[in-house]
Curated annotation (Swiss-Prot):
Name of the protein: Phosphoglucosamine mutase
Source taxon at top rank: Bacteria
Cofactors, names only: Mg(2+)
Enzyme class at the top of the EC tree: isomerase
HAMAP family documented for this protein: GlmM_B
One GO biological process term: UDP-N-acetylglucosamine biosynthetic process
Active site per UniProt: S99
Lineage of origin: Bacteria, Pseudomonadati, Campylobacterota, Epsilonproteobacteria, Campylobacterales
Gene3D superfamilies in alphabetical order: Alpha-D-Glucose-1,6-Bisphosphate, subunit A, domain 3, Alpha-D-phosphohexomutase, C-terminal domain
Function statement: Catalyzes the conversion of glucosamine-6-phosphate to glucosamine-1-phosphate.
Similarity-based family: Belongs to the phosphohexose mutase family.
């Protein structure tokens, strides 16, 4: 049985992800990290879901039972956990979040001592420990060796300083009116503070978390309300974050929601013009064909990888690169962060606007994405795609019609993601109906 998906362990809180699983998983991870322990401290943060308290207590119980000390820092963005794990010299960091998912889901993500997400090999080792009853039992310590847990509430300042240091020293946000949608999530304190301290006029939306409203009709997955507010308030730009603030969606001054690949393209060019872009840009296999065309036109190479910001980071390391991301809004500036950081991306786009003295719409309009259709189809089972009868023929037929395809299963849900891309939207709509019917029969039979 696999516990880890594309981004940690995730599922419905209280059902799949209950206190027993969380405690045992924490013990398994702690056993793994003990071999490389330097400080015997593990950092634990969370987003604003009500179930986070249950899972946090279970994780603390699991870690202290095998002798680890735990530092609890409360609601903080996922990239803050990555940064603070290394900054506070902890052996590992744990983030309790289901990112953009609804409140009833939750998840557990791990970071190593350097703030990096774990490789699949390490995740498999932790899973092996999880299912090894003898090892779990043998790792429990005597009473006098049980670890301690302490809560620290003032570490937010360290993260804010690191975020502000990513913004050019010769610029100020004083001329910008910015609307922030913080999704009732982990950035509800951090994001407004950063933008205000850098001088922006800030209007904040969805900043009253109650444990049940995270991502609900707000944030990066639902930018419609932000778009309306940007227009109504005549703001220069709007930024929407998801529940754990590792992704960003930009809304221009006209209330138009920017395509994630357009954002990647213009930020890559901005880095190149400053002489800061190293090696090729990395995007995922879901990236729009127009991104590659735009980058190549400006002498920038594009490499692709599997979906997931940890795969983007792995490819960047392999290539010696420092910039990449996903169409969904995970954008990695590896000079400043070890994972996707919505706040850093928002500040870099603000710096681009200010340095060019141009509007958000004119900057983003440089990349004109090809039409894409993406459907998340609920399915009964996940069959091996290579063994589905007729799929090769279907893909060949679409290819002959100049339609690019990508079919992949969700790593966390019973869904298949169906992506079609072409220059003709009517053709896409027609062919998508056929594709949906094909997979309904193949995977719900």
């Amino acid at each position: 049985m696999r516990l880890f998906g594309t981004d940690g362990v995730r599922g419905k809180a209280g059902e799949f992800l209950d206190s027993f699983l969380a405690m045992r998983l924490a013990m398994a991870a702690g056993i793994y990290f003990k071999d490389k322990s330097i400080t015997n401290n593990i950092l634990v943060g969370k987003d604003t879901r009500r179930s986070g308290y249950m899972i946090e207590n279970a994780i603390v119980s699991g870690l202290t039972s095998i002798g680890y000390n735990v530092i609890q820092i409360g609601p903080m963005p996922t990239p803050a956990i990555a940064f603070l794990t290394e900054d506070m010299r902890c052996d590992a960091g744990i983030m309790i979040s289901a990112s953009h998912n609804p409140y009833y889901d939750n998840g557990i993500k791990f970071f190593d001592a350097h703030g990096n997400k774990l490789s699949e090999d390490i995740e498999k080792k932790i899973e092996e420990i999880y299912f090894d009853d003898k090892l779990i039992q043998a790792s429990k310590v005597d009473m006098e060796k049980i670890g301690q847990a302490k809560r620290i509430d003032d570490v937010i300042g360290r993260y804010i300083v690191s975020i502000k240091n990513s913004f050019p020293k010769d610029l100020t946000l004083k001329s910008l009116r910015v609307v922030l949608d913080v999704a009732h999530g982990a950035a509800y304190k951090v994001a407004p503070t950063v933008f205000k301290e850098l001088g922006a006029e800030v209007i904040v939306m969805s900043d009253k978390p109650n444990g049940l409203n995270i991502n609900e009709n707000c944030g990066a997955l639902h930018p419609v309300n932000l778009a309306a507010e940007v227009k109504r308030l005549r703001a220069d730009v709007g930024f929407a974050f998801d529940g754990d603030a590792d992704r960003l969606v930009v809304v221009d001054e006209k209330g138009e929601v920017a395509n994630g690949d357009s954002l990647l393209g213009v930020l890559a060019l901005y880095l190149k013009e400053q002489g800061k872009l190293q090696s090729s840009v990395v995007a995922t296999i879901m990236s729009n064909g127009a991104l590659k065309e735009f980058l190549n036109k400006h002498g920038i190479e594009l490499d692709t990888c599997n979906v997931g910001d940890k795969y983007v980071l792995e490819k960047l390391k392999a290539n010696g690169g420092n910039f990449g991301g996903e169409q969904s809004g995970h954008i990695i500036f590896s000079d400043y962060a070890k994972t996707g950081d919505g706040l850093i991306a928002a500040l870099q786009f603000s710096a681009l606007m200010l340095s060019k003295k141009k509007s958000a719409s004119s900057i983003l309009g440089q990349v004109k994405p090809y039409p894409q259709l993406l459907i998340n189809l609920k399915i009964a089972e996940k069959k091996d795609l290579d063994k589905i009868k007729g799929l090769k023929e279907l893909k060949k037929d679409l290819e002959n019609k100049n339609i690019n395809t990508l079919f992949r299963y969700s790593g966390t849900e019973n869904l298949i993601r169906l992506l079609l891309e072409a220059r003709d939207i009517k053709l896409l709509e027609k062919e998508m109906k056929n594709v949906v019917e094909f997979f309904k029969k193949a995977l719900n039979g």
